Design a protein with these regions (language model features):
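Residues forming anionic-ligand binding surfaces in small-molecule and nucleic-acid pockets
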Residues: 1-11
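Inter-helical turn/loop segments and adjacent helix faces that build the functional surface
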Residues: 10-18
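Residue-level marker of positions within ordered structural domains that often coincide
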Residues: 11, 32, 91
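Long, well-ordered alpha-helical scaffolding segments within enzyme catalytic domains
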Residues: 18-35
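Low-complexity, flexible helical/coil segments
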Residues: 19-22, 40-45, 120-124, 152-155
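Alpha-helical scaffold segments that mediate packing/assembly in large oligomeric complexes
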Residues: 32-68
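A translation/RNA-centric and nucleic-acid-associated enzymatic feature enriched
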Residues: 61-156
Length: 156
C-alpha cells in the first residue's frame, strides 16, 4: 500500500461541514476521472462508481444498524450506495464506543471521515481516503480530554 498525505491551508471560516463536503466531492470527482481514464486504456478494467458520493455520519450508521459492528455498518451501507463518505469519526456514539479510533491531536472528530468504495470482487468496502479538517486549540484540548491525554499539551 502507498499512502500520500497532503495539506491545504484554509481560513477559519472554512472550518465547517459544508467546506469538508466540498473537498470530499472534489476528491471523489478526481477518483472517478482517473477510473474513466484507466477503463479507456484498459477496457477489461471497469469501475462501478456512482455519479455522486453519499454522506453518512457515524451516528446515522449506528441508528440504522445497531446490531452490527462499525465495520459491518460501513459494509452494509457502502454495498447499497457504492461510494460513501463516513464522517464524524472519533467521539463515542450512543453505545459509548467510538466508531473507530482517531488520534486526538490530528483531525477534528466532527470534521473528519473516510471515503469508502464498494469492491465487488472482495465483497467489501475499501477505504481509499481518510481525511479531515485539522484541530484548532479548543478542539485539541477537548479531544485530548476525551482520550485522557492532556499531558500531550505540555509536549512539543
Amino acid at each position: 500500500m502507498d499512502q500520500w498525505d497532503w495539506e491545504k491551508i484554509i481560513r477559519p471560516d472554512q472550518r465547517n461541514y459544508t467546506y469538508l463536503k466540498t473537498v470530499v466531492r472534489a476528491v471523489y470527482l478526481a477518483v472517478r476521472r482517473i477510473a474513466a481514464q484507466v477503463t479507456k486504456k484498459y477496457p477489461a478494467l471497469t469501475f462501478d462508481l456512482p455519479r455522486e458520493i453519499t454522506f453518512v455520519s457515524t451516528k446515522e450508521l449506528e441508528k440504522m444498524y445497531p446490531a452490527l459492528t462499525p465495520r459491518e455498518r460501513e459494509n452494509a451501507f457502502t454495498k447499497t450506495y457504492r461510494a460513501v463518505f463516513v464522517y464524524q469519526i472519533g467521539w463515542p456514539l450512543a453505545n459509548k464506543q467510538p466508531h473507530d479510533g482517531r488520534a486526538a491531536d490530528y483531525d477534528d472528530w466532527k470534521l473528519n471521515g473516510d471515503i469508502l468504495l464498494w469492491h465487488e470482487p472482495l465483497d467489501c468496502a475499501l477505504e481509499i481516503s481518510s481525511m479531515g479538517i485539522r484541530v484548532n486549540a479548543a478542539v485539541l484540548e477537548k479531544q485530548l480530554r476525551q482520550k485522557k491525554e492532556l499531558d500531550k499539551l505540555s509536549k512539543p
